[in-house]
């Protein structure tokens, strides 16, 4: 309808118009930028194993580091083998501090230690990794709720973003993942990964419409 009203017939202009319409649907008139204020601002990253949470955290850490911000990463996925080691690599690349414990430690304890490491140190952003064991759904969801309660209690004034990471190639499975994680966390944004292939991430419109 918009194309007809504007008398758009050129395919390139039509593509641009369509892209803007889709962007408007996702933005919904709100600011799509991450809200980062308070010392520290918290960005909690959630999602099932294998979707790219660790890589996402590394990229966000690198982005804020390049902006001159002081960043700390909390390695709270203590269950997946090599999760902590992968974050060590990313934190070294970005030049940011990593707070960790041994594999199998209480994730909430890692978050608590990370908060204490930030207090009084002028840390701008605390990035929190989390586990993604959806096959153990009940324990995972309770764990996420516990982590958020600690963040809310210890850092009441700072901004808190909860980003759900979804693999763009998974289609309808991503909708189900969004539903299940929304039961445990107040998701503020979605990160789509693996868009370098044929997947274009159209599933976000279904998620936006439903949730």
List each language-model region with its residue ranges.
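Short glycine-rich anion-binding loops that position phosphate/pyrophosphate groups of nucleotides
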Residues: 131-133
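Acidic active-site catalytic centers that drive phospho-/nucleotidyl reactions
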Residues: 53, 77, 129, 167, ...
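Primarily NTPase-proximal linker/entry elements flanking Walker-type ATP/GTP-binding cores
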Residues: 1-76, 83-119, 123-128
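Conserved catalytic-core segment of NTP-binding enzymes
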Residues: 106-121, 135-211
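Non-catalytic, surface-exposed connector residues within folded enzymatic/regulatory domains
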Residues: 8, 12, 81, 138, ...
């Amino acid at each position: 309808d918009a194309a007809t009203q504007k008398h758009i017939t050129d395919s390139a202009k039509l593509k641009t118009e369509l892209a803007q319409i889709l962007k408007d649907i996702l933005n919904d008139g709100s600011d799509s930028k991450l809200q980062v204020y308070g010392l520290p601002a918290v960005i909690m990253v959630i999602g099932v194993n294998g979707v790219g949470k660790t890589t996402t955290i590394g990229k966000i850490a690198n982005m804020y580091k390049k902006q001159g911000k002081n960043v700390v990463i909390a390695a709270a996925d203590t269950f997946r083998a090599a999760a902590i080691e992968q974050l060590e690599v990313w934190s070294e690349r970005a030049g940011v501090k990593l707070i960790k414990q041994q594999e199998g430690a209480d994730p909430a304890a890692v978050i608590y230690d990370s908060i204490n490491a930030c207090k009084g140190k002028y840390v701008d952003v605390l990035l929190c990794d989390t586990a993604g064991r959806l096959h153990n759904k009940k324990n995972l969801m309770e764990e996420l709720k516990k982590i958020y309660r600690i963040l809310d209690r210890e850092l009441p004034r700072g901004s808190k973003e909860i980003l759900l990471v979804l693999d763009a190639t998974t289609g309808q499975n991503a909708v189900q993942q969004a539903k299940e994680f929304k039961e445990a966390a107040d998701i503020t944004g979605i990160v789509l990964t693996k868009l370098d292939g044929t997947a274009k991430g159209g599933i976000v419109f279904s998620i936006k419409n439903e949730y």
